[in-house]
Amino acid sequence: MSPVPVSLAELTARHRDGIVGYLVRLLGDRQEAEDACQDAFLRAHQAFARLGPEANSRAWLYRIATRSGLNAARRRSRRTARAADVDLDSLPAAAGLSPERREELLAIRRAVERLPPRQRAALMLRQFEGFGYAEIAVALGGSEQGARANVYQAIKKLRATLGGARRRDAKR
């Protein structure tokens, strides 16, 4: 549990980069993630006085960021389907990869983007942010059992989707 920081400025300095990274993975777009992060910190500023001394400030802030990210994803899904628009060249980690590996990464990215928003958020918090299930529960506003179920279902769906793609490729 993170102690409540002396100020929102301390909380921002401590967690901003991590939240932006989480939102980039959640949303797949840096500018959209920056906007959602800004919205999250604005909302955190408005609610900071209500943060209790025993509260897990990290999970509290990620809960606000998750809501901002999910709201942004809903707005985007109303406008367009983005999975086909992913440009791996824009990702620094994609430089120098073989065409086959790039296709694998693109398939993974598309499969993750197709997950229901809560499952995607739970998976990102667990796998990339290192959250425990109790922290995920706080961040998503649910129970620890619900957090476990969301991560489990996300992994199960990814395995089914990606396993099916591998079987199809093997038959070619």
Predicted region positions:
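DNA-recognition helix of helix-turn-helix
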Residues: T66, L70, L140-G164
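Structural recognition of an alpha-helix C-terminal capping motif at a helix-to-coil junction
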Residues: D35-L42, A55-R67
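Arg/Lys-rich amphipathic alpha helix in sigma70-family domain 2
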Residues: G52-P53, R63-A84, R101, G164-R166
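Internal acidic/polar
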Residues: S2, R79-L105, R109, G132
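A short, charge-rich alpha-helical start-of-domain segment used by transcription regulators
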Residues: M1-G21, Q31-C37, H45
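Short, Lys/Arg-enriched C-terminal cap helix and immediately downstream tail that follows
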Residues: R74, L115, I155-R172
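Sigma70-family region 2
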Residues: S2, D39-N56, R75-S77, T161
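A short pre-motif secondary-structure segment
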Residues: A122-R126
